[in-house]
């Protein structure tokens, strides 16, 4: 046994490689052992340090892989399970347990998280050399009973199925202990690099091999000052020093100091010594100069995105300045990998920097996992429509084209069907021939056939079920789709998809191993498959060695790369505080460690945090050979964050914090990193809306624009202006002539007018391009309205011989039997319930019609407008026609005055502010249209709410009071002529604010015509601005902004181009109500018309 240590600025790997070469020269076969996270890097470093750059006698490996290189005899042939197989075994065993048998975990026995925690505990106990029977020492009776029962069940199952238990290392330990290793131990040597602690399992291997006479060399980083100090607690080197002291004491071998004398103390050595002295409370006077501050820089950035952009620019700049540098000379360390992963790819692709993030990717979000999840949902929830759509959207099931899938999805959404029997019925319903039923039925059979065959599978042996699954994958064209998908991808993506398929097949292999000979139902198989795939991970390797390696900062080793950028070093990320999320608490771990034999030790993360984090910080400070950049953003994951305390210490020693910002207001030579990044910088520069006033900057932009313009012209491309906000183009004359020929009538409806004033571009989408909402066979607000309209139309047309209630019931019965409504409201139990609610509404609304003797209905569903009478005349002489339909026309019996009624499903009132801004023209339009048809005598225009009044019983003193309050809401709301109001009864809300004189009435009609004229002129000119209106000047209502995905309008960026509603200019902040408010708006209307 030989123990070595060296100072942190001397390469330990180089020293240990020399030791390995000496052992090879002595005839030994050397196993160079590195930690799992560093094994690939160590292999490359060892090869670089070898005098001949290669050796057949040195194998760089990990502890777990050593068994592969040793000859093990007479070991029983057992199948080894990995985490996926182990998870399936736990799932199977827990499924067989009755929830009542488990006191703590019964309710969550098949929860994926619990299974994951059980797997972790299984591995942890194996590594710590602890038997599951040691759990008898747990003090919590319920937990002890549950864990013992679970592990006994799993262990018995693994033994029964001849499945290997434990890790590869535990098998090696067993083989050495039982003399089952035929390799000559005298010819073997171990060199161990990069460890600051051994697990109980690793220490047992070292102990056994040492006992067999294997030469072992172990090296670690430590300063002589730290190693010889009698007190190491709190020291930066505490982890490595305690490790060396423990081994020295155990094997009676003092550690040798292999530190080298450096001619000059570099910046990183200086920072290390200052940090060490601050933690061991010794005094040290070292000056930090400008060169040190240049070599070790501390950046303070605003956001994570800005950090990455600055790093990318810095790398590009260094590559530009020094042609000898390549990407492999750079290393990026992340404070939190998950938070940077997405932005990293976006920004580094933009700057054309190849990188490799050495991290396994989860399969949870891959389409193949979603494919299995969708089939499981179809089986479990009995063929829901949404699950079938999700299955088709994976693009892995069937070889249908995207247009076929879209057509099928649109049709089944139209039908609103759920359940396999509904899908098995031939599609026969169509909407005025809109759907190609013949083609849809062909698609239906193609989609259903493989699923029907699979879902017919009963509980059977796992082998048979896997055969049926294989047939399903072929019939459903899943394998073909995956092949087609990969052929169109780049090489890197093809490799990624290959790894995913391997992982998928591996889950199936593990399932076959675990459930060999067992009876399994299809739903359980799919659940297990999905669970296994969710746990699966895959990893790709970089296509080339020359890439920027990216990793978590806590996996770094000293002297790793020439230039190191460590970003995201906030207080939350540095240091990392390991949390115990396992099934055993720290107290329980401590108790188990005390009650079990020596050499059996569970890790207690909280006790390791301090010494581990200090050693990690030391490694981080010494990770670079030439230049180190430490950065912390002010905003991390959209929350305010502070820089790490370790960075503050370095600043205290004399290193300077540099405020770094991306400056889009100016362009510099640093922007010339790559073509894509330059283009991005140019876009950002334009989007600032500000141009630098300096002549030099303006000249640079002009020249740059000309160069890019010439390059684009050579390739036959256009150089478009960079838009700063969404905008629309005016329609060409040819288009306008095709849309609105001069000899053809131009029609505008009241709903079209409202849409235009909501957002001009919405009018263009709906009334010019004909954008339609998705069709639904199920009842919706439109069908509800038509149903109620039809009932009242029929009830009022029936002869007056019978009472109103009898006529209403007859109308309800006849309308319900109409083919259109019968199809809708008999479709499902939900639709039938909706119909009953609507009938209650009809009977309630009938109360107003039943007790209103002052009026008589003369027309229902009355059409108005047409070619005979133009609504308005434009300045160019062109006529505008308005057409529509009035729900009902009433007549006063007293003097024959006419009134119009529009049915509404909710409370609607006429509002002067909305009318002035073009958003409430319905009632004035109806009156104007009837006036143009010859009617002169009106009593008003109103809305009638068709709804059951809801009254809070808490707000009234008695039930009688509730009836009175409810009846107040059941009134006609709208506009009434003052001279006719005396003839109207209690069912009309005729307060002063709603009453108009003849002059005011005409004023409203004139302004309404003015609104139509303004809209018609813009429409006929082909100008449709993207200008949704805003009422409060701060946001856009959702119903106004319905086409955001098309227009790209975002209120937080583009509110300036929204249409701000006109408001009253009130002095002294007065608030007007009632009659005064009406008069104020009428005065504003007069002013607008007189302009």
UniProtKB/Swiss-Prot annotation:
Cross-referenced SUPFAM superfamilies = P-loop containing nucleoside triphosphate hydrolases (SSF52540), Restriction endonuclease-like (SSF52980)
Tell me its cofactors.
Answer: Mg(2+)
So what EC number does this one have?
A: 3.1.-.-
Q: Name one GO molecular function term.
A: double-stranded DNA binding
Pfam families with a match to the protein in the record? ADDB_N, PDDEXK_1
Instruction: Establish whether keyword Iron is in the entry.
Output: no
GO biological-process terms attached to the record: double-strand break repair via homologous recombination
Return the broad EC class: hydrolase
Q: Which UniProt keywords apply?
A: ATP-binding, DNA damage, DNA repair, DNA-binding, Exonuclease, Helicase, Hydrolase, Nuclease, Nucleotide-binding
Other observations noted: Despite having helicase-like domains, this subunit does not have helicase activity.
Give the protein's function: The heterodimer acts as both an ATP-dependent DNA helicase and an ATP-dependent, dual-direction single-stranded exonuclease. Recognizes the chi site generating a DNA molecule suitable for the initiation of homologous recombination. This subunit has 5' -> 3' nuclease activity but not helicase activity.
Alphabetized PANTHER family for the sequence: RECBCD ENZYME SUBUNIT RECC
Q: Which family does it belong to?
A: Belongs to the helicase family. AddB/RexB type 2 subfamily.
Give the record's subunit note.
Answer: Heterodimer of AddA and RexB.
Spell out the protein name for this chain: ATP-dependent helicase/deoxyribonuclease subunit B
**Organism annotation:** Streptococcus pneumoniae (strain Hungary19A-6)
């Amino acid at each position: 046994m030989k123990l070595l240590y060296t100072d942190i600025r001397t390469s330990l790997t180089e020293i240990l490689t020399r030791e390995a070469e000496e052992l090879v020269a002595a005839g030994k076969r050397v196993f160079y052992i590195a930690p799992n996270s560093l094994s690939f890097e160590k292999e490359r470093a060892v090869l670089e340090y070898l005098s001949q750059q290669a050796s057949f006698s040195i194998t760089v490996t990990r502890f777990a892989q050593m068994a592969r290189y040793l000859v093990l005899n007479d070991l029983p042939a057992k199948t080894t399970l990995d985490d996926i197989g182990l998870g399936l075994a736990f799932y199977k065993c827990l499924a067989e347990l009755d929830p009542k048998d488990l006191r703590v975990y019964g309710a969550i026995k098949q929860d994926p998280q619990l299974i994951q925690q059980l797997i972790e505990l299984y591995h942890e106990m194996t590594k710590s050399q602890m038997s599951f029977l040691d759990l008898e020492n747990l003090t919590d009776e319920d937990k002890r009973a549950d864990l013992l029962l679970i592990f006994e069940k799993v262990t018995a199952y693994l033994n029964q199925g001849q499945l290997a238990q434990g890790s590869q290392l535990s098998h090696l330990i067993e083989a050495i202990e039982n003399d089952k290793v035929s390799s000559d131990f005298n010819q073997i040597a171990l060199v161990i690099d990069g460890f600051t602690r051994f697990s109980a399992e690793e220490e047992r291997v070292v102990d056994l091999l040492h006992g067999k006479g294997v030469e072992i060399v172990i090296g670690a980083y430590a300063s002589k000052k730290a190693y010889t100090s009698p007190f190491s607690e709190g020291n930066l080197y505490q982890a490595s020093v305690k490790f060396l002291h423990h081994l020295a004491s155990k094997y009676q071998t003092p550690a040798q100091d292999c530190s080298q004398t450096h001619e000059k103390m570099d910046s990183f050595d200086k920072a290390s010594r200052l940090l060490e002295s601050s933690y061991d409370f010794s005094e040290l006077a070292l000056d930090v100069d400008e060169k040190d501050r240049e070599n070790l820089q501390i950046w303070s950035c605003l956001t994570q995105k800005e950090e990455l952009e600055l790093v990318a620019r810095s790398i590009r700049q260094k590559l530009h300045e020094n042609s000898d540098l390549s990407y492999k000379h750079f290393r990026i360390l992340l404070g939190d990998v998950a938070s940077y992963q997405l932005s990293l790819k976006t920004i580094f692709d933009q700057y054309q920097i190849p990188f490799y993030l050495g991290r396994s990717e989860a399969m949870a979000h891959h389409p193949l996992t979603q494919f299995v999840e969708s089939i499981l949902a179809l089986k479990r929830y009995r063929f829901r429509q949404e699950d079938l759509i999700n299955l088709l959207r994976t693009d892995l099931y069937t070889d249908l084209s995207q247009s076929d899938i879209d057509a099928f999805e649109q049709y089944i959404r139209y039908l609103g069907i759920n359940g396999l029997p509904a899908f098995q019925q031939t599609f026969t319903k169509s909407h005025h021939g809109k759907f190609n039923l013949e083609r849809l039925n062909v698609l239906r059979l193609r989609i259903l056939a493989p699923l029907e065959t699979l879902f017919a599978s009963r509980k059977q042996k796992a082998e048979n079920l896997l055969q049926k699954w294989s047939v399903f994958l072929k019939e459903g064209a899943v394998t073909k789709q995956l092949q087609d998908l990969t052929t169109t991808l780049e090489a890197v993506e093809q490799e990624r998809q290959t790894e995913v398929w391997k992982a998928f097949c591996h889950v199936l292999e593990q399932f076959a191993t675990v459930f060999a000979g067992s009876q399994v139902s299809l739903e359980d198989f799919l659940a297990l498959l999905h669970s296994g795939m969710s746990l699966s991970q895959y990893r790709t390797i970089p296509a080339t060695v020359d890439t920027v390696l990216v990793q978590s900062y806590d996996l770094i080793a000293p002297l790793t790369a020439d230039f190191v950028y460590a970003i995201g070093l906030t207080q939350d990320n540095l240091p990392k505080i390991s949390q115990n999320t396992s099934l055993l608490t720290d107290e329980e771990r401590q108790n188990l460690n005390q009650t079990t034999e020596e050499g059996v030790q569970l890790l207690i993360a909280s006790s390791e945090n301090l010494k581990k984090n200090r050693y990690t910080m030391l490694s981080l400070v010494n990770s670079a050979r030439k230049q180190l950049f430490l950065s912390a953003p002010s905003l991390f994951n959209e929350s305010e964050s502070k820089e790490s305390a370790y960075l503050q210490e370095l600043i205290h020693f004399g290193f300077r914090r540099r405020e770094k910002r991306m400056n889009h207001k100016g362009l510099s030579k640093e922007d010339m990193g790559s073509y894509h990044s330059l283009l991005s910088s140019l876009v950002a520069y334009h989007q600032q809306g500000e141009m630098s006033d300096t002549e030099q900057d303006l000249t640079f932009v002009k020249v740059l624009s000309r160069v890019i313009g010439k390059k684009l012209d050579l390739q036959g491309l256009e150089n478009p202006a960079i838009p700063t906000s969404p905008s629309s183009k005016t329609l060409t004359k040819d288009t306008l002539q095709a849309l609105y020929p001069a000899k053809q009538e131009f029609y505008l409806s009241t709903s079209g007018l409202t849409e235009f004033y909501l957002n001009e571009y919405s009018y263009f989408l709906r009334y010019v391009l004909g954008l339609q909402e998705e069709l639904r066979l199920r009842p919706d607000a439109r069908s509800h309205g038509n149903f109620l309209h039809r009932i009242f139309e029929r009830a009022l047309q029936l002869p007056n011989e019978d009472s109103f209630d009898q006529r209403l019931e007859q109308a309800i019965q006849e309308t319900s039997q109409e083919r259109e409504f019968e199809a809708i409201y008999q479709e499902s139990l939900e639709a039938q319930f909706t119909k009953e609610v609507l009938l209650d509404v009809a009977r309630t609304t009938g109360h107003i019609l039943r007790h209103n003797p002052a009026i008589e209905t003369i027309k229902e569903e009355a059409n108005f407008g047409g070619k005979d009478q133009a609504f308005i005349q434009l300045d160019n002489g062109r006529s505008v026609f308005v057409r529509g339909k009035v729900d009902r026309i009433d007549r006063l019996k007293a003097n024959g005055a006419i009134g119009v009624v529009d049915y509404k499903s909710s409370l609607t009132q006429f509002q002067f502010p909305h009318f002035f801004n073009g958003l409430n023209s319905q009632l004035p339009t109806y009156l104007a249209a009837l006036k143009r048809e010859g009617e002169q005598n009106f009593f008003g225009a109103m809305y009638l709410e068709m709804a059951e009044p809801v009254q809070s019983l808490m707000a009234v003193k008695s039930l009688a009071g509730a009836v009175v309050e409810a009846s107040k809401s059941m009134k006609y709301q709208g506009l009434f002529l003052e001279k006719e109001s005396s003839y109207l009864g209690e069912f009309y809300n005729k307060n002063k604010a709603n009453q108009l004189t003849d002059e005011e009435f005409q004023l409203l009609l004139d302004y309404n015509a003015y609104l139509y004229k303004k809209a018609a002129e813009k429409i006929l000119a082909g100008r449709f601005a993207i200008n949704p209106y805003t009422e409060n000047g701060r946001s856009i209502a959702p119903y106004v902004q319905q086409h955001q995905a098309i227009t790209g309008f975002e209120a937080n960026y583009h509110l300036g181009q929204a249409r701000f509603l006109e408001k009253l200019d009130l002095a002294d902040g007065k608030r007007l109500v009632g009659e005064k408010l009406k008069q104020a708006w009428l005065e504003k209307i007069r002013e607008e018309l007189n302009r």
